[in-house]
Amino acid sequence: MPKIRIKLRGFDHKTLDASAQKIVEAARRSGAQVSGPIPLPTRVRRFTVIRGPFKHKDSREHFELRTHNRLVDIINPNRKTIEQLMTLDLPTGVEIEIKTVGGGR
């Protein structure tokens, strides 16, 4: 059974969820089955920086960068599904990775 797997990445979870919802609606309008959006683990990168430029090593500041991930599977896509996905306008700040899974002959 052919399947399109779409991975979404971004720093803002609200924008990411809105983008995933747009993809799900477009796929359902074309008649394909949709699984997701499935939230994947959030990657958290933490940075510790010394506040002062010269000394005062005990005074530090902590920053973190959260990368949120979502997964959407489109099962049995047709030509209309692919056309809908190609014309979809998604906001900036969302990275999209599209793969085809299964359906190999």
From Swiss-Prot:
Q: Which UniProt key words apply to this protein?
A: Ribonucleoprotein, Ribosomal protein, RNA-binding, rRNA-binding
Which terms does the UniProt entry file under GO BP? translation
What GO cellular-component annotations does this UniProt entry give?
ribonucleoprotein complex; ribosome
Transmembrane ranges, per UniProt, are: none
Q: Which SUPFAM superfamilies match?
A: Ribosomal protein S10 (SSF54999)
What GO MF annotations does this protein's record show? rRNA binding; structural constituent of ribosome; tRNA binding
Question: Would you identify the family this protein belongs to, as annotated?
Answer: Belongs to the universal ribosomal protein uS10 family.
Function as written in the Swiss-Prot or TrEMBL entry: Involved in the binding of tRNA to the ribosomes. Part of the top of the 30S subunit head.
What quaternary arrangement does the UniProt entry report?
Answer: Part of the 30S ribosomal subunit. Forms a tight complex with proteins S3 and S14. Also contacts protein S9.
Specify the protein name: Small ribosomal subunit protein uS10
